[in-house]
Amino acid sequence: MRINKIQLHNFRNFSDTSFEFPSQFTVVIGENRRGKSSLLQGIRLAAGTFLLGLDEPPRLHIQKEDVRRIDVGQRFVPQRDCFFHAWGELNNQHLEWKRTLAREGGRTDYKEAYPLIELAENLNNRVNQRLENSVDMPVFCFFSTARLWSESKQRIDLKKKGSKIKDGYGKCLDIKSDRITSLQWIKANYYKQLKGKDTEGFITGSSQSNNNLCTELERTGMGRRLG
């Protein structure tokens, strides 16, 4: 999935601003409090519209803190019609979608986001209803500064069987870090390999690679929490 352009209207500190992303890699540079995080939040919500078409992942909506406010002296007045409008493509289809929070305290509508939602629903049905194994799903990763050191130390248990959709998209756009899910998967497949069972993905590599991984986890202190 690719977002080529996004318009932010009454969104955080943007009254009405558009951004284009013409290349495969975009770097945003600016002084503090100039809107870099606001832009990332808008992109996060735009990408999160895809999740509305899936059965299990959490939904993302425009929140009251996303609504632009104007200083009128004694108070800040929230502005109406806070929205993001995005243009992009997924699986070679050009898409345009928009979500709006008409007023503070209302709900984020999705009536203009159906092109992306319906495409997501189709992919979801292929995975969960038709049980197809070769479905090209988009990859989402969101990393904000809030992810740094936001998790306390905790024990990592073996990963039990679950949903491919839920596992893949459960916390993909969460503002907090989640290393537990991936490490559960690594640990479960590592134990499968030790028992001679079939494993998934990159865990099918050599035993030496897995030993190096465990050694590194122990060196960083995470190995003790894996046990």
State each model region's role.
Residues 1-187, 198-205, 222:
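P-loop NTPase switch/coupling surface
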Residues 209-221:
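Zn2+-dependent metallopeptidase catalytic core
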Residues 223-227:
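Long, charged, glycine-rich C-terminal linkers/tails
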